[in-house]
Amino acid sequence: MEDSGKTFGSEEEETNYWRDLAMTYKQRAENTQEELREFQEGSREYEAELETQLQQAETRNRDLLSENNRLRMELESVKEKFEMQHSEGYRQISALEDDLAHTKAIKDQLQKYIRELEQANDDLERAKRATIMSLEDFEQRLNQAIERNAFLESELDEKENLLESVQRLKDEARDLRQELAVQQKQDKPRTPMPSSGETKRTDMAVQATGSAPSTPITHQGSSSGLNTPETFRCGLGSPSSGTPLTPAARISALNIVGDLLRKVGALESKLASCKNFMYDQSPSRKSGPALGRGTKNRDGIDRRPGSTAVGDKGSGKRLEFAKPSSQLSSPALPSTQGVVKLLL
């Protein structure tokens, strides 16, 4: 201590010194006690406050623990739900993948089916075009058949005209034979009779002219020859019958026309030879007896009313046969003009 080595001048001074020092220490002790008391009060208050805070903290801790437990339970439930959702999502994803694969397969099948439909459509369009072309060809052939029918009807009309001319020539031949017989009876003393061979040939020509054609046409299902225009028309078939004319029937019809033309030409030549023979035997004969046939001119040609001479009639008939037909003709058949010219 610093005061232990201090020296005093007197005892009173030392007593005062120690009294002052004691008072100082006493004051310090009182101050320290006061501070201790204040500190204790403050510590008690602080302790109470800490206890209060501790209680609050414990309460809060309990609340937090309960909340933690609740959150853990919720977490477990959420985990379970997540696992369930995950498994459900996986199943849905698997199902969607299967559906996607199935949809892709269906899409491929549909694309294949579309390609097949397009190919079938192309085939149908080609078949349609082929059908249209076949229909056009059928219409063309139908028109050709109609033209052939019209041409054959014109041929039938010409055949009827030929039959009428043959009948007229037969009548004229019969009249000429009768006239020749009468003139032979009148000129018997000075005109020799024609030979039996010539008469026989004339009769045979006339009979051949009136006989049936050498190439008959038979209708389907019929075995008899066609000798008249009606049977010939039935044999060829009308345009509305629907049966097309065969090439053999066309050739037969042309053969009939050719036979008729040849027979008409033979008959005309026979008539001309008979007239020449008759006029050579009697160059200066008078007009014939009144048999209702008109008069003859100085050349010996019969000029009956409403009729022409046999030679003129034959020439006119030849010219009439040589005229082209005004009816429609088929490209597959030769024209009547060419046939008549070839036959004449």
From Swiss-Prot:
InterPro entries: NUDE, NUDE_dom. It is found in: Cytoplasm, Cytoskeleton; Cytoplasm, Cytoskeleton, Microtubule organizing center, Centrosome; Cytoplasm, Cytoskeleton, Spindle; Chromosome, Centromere, Kinetochore. GO terms for biological process: cell division; cell migration; centrosome duplication; centrosome localization; cerebral cortex development; chromosome segregation; establishment of chromosome localization; establishment of mitotic spindle orientation. Residues 18-188 form a coiled coil. Expressed in brain, heart, kidney, liver, lung, skeletal muscle, spleen and testis. Residues 30-65, 181-243, 279-337 are annotated as: Disordered. GO terms for cellular component: centrosome; cleavage furrow; cytoplasmic vesicle membrane; kinesin complex; kinetochore; microtubule; microtubule organizing center; spindle. One of its GO terms (molecular function) is identical protein binding. Residues 1-93 are annotated as: Self-association. The modification Phosphoserine is found at residues 211, 282. Keywords: Cell cycle, Cell division, Centromere, Chromosome, Coiled coil, Cytoplasm, Cytoplasmic vesicle, Cytoskeleton, Developmental protein, Differentiation, Kinetochore, Lipoprotein, Membrane, Microtubule, Mitosis, Neurogenesis, Palmitate, Phosphoprotein. Residues 88-156 are annotated as: Interaction with PAFAH1B1. Residues 167-290 are annotated as: Interaction with CENPF. A lipid is attached at residue 274 (S-palmitoyl cysteine). Phosphorylated in mitosis. Phosphorylation at Thr-246 is essential for the G2/M transition. Residues 324-335 have a biased composition (Low complexity). Residues 208-230 have a biased composition (Polar residues). The modification Phosphothreonine is found at residues 215, 228, 243, 246. Belongs to the nudE family. Required for centrosome duplication and formation and function of the mitotic spindle. Essential for the development of the cerebral cortex. May regulate the production of neurons by controlling the orientation of the mitotic spindle during division of cortical neuronal progenitors of the proliferative ventricular zone of the brain. Orientation of the division plane perpendicular to the layers of the cortex gives rise to two proliferative neuronal progenitors whereas parallel orientation of the division plane yields one proliferative neuronal progenitor and a postmitotic neuron. This is Nuclear distribution protein nudE homolog 1. It comes from Rattus norvegicus. The gene is Nde1.
